[in-house]
Amino acid sequence: MKKWMLAICLMFINEICQATDCFDLAGRDYKIDPDLLRAISWKESRYRVNAIGINPVTGYGSGLMQVDSQHFNELARYGIKPEHLTTDPCMNIYTGAYYLAIAFKKWGVTWEAVGAYNAGFRKSERQNQRRLAYASEVYRIYTGIKSSKGIRLPATKKSLPEINSVQNN
């Protein structure tokens, strides 16, 4: 029984270690702070590689970054299948970074774009509120990650700091 549990623990640790490297690699390749990707992943899945989350509007999210099923047809053109997103941590992280980079390209490197990763780009008061709530939660997680590395960021409830100034820390 102990050997069986040890094997499961080692597999889990191996997946987490691989995923950690992938946050750094995807961050480098997409010019996104890897800690921001980590914060989004924690918010989306609590770092669970095989997480599936129900989205009442578009279907469901898959894996660490909760890549939404609405993107599956586009991803299929690149050979990415839905099952890859829950079994390959690196592919999931890179895919999430890709969609965050699209949001940054569309709206600039802003917390509103981070919010759009989850709540989309539709312009309405409700969507604006959802984007702000999501971005605020990601920012809270992000500051925790930075704090654990000895980096202090402004803690604010009124407005989020400029993302470029935060990423440079």
From Swiss-Prot:
Domain of life (superkingdom): Bacteria
Q: What SUPFAM superfamilies does this protein map onto? A: Lysozyme-like
Note whether NAD occurs among the keywords.
no
Tell me the protein's name.
X polypeptide
Q: Does the keyword Translocase apply?
A: no
Organism listed in the record:
Escherichia coli
Q: Name the family.
A: Belongs to the IagB/IpgF/P19 family.
Q: Which UniProt keywords apply?
A: Plasmid
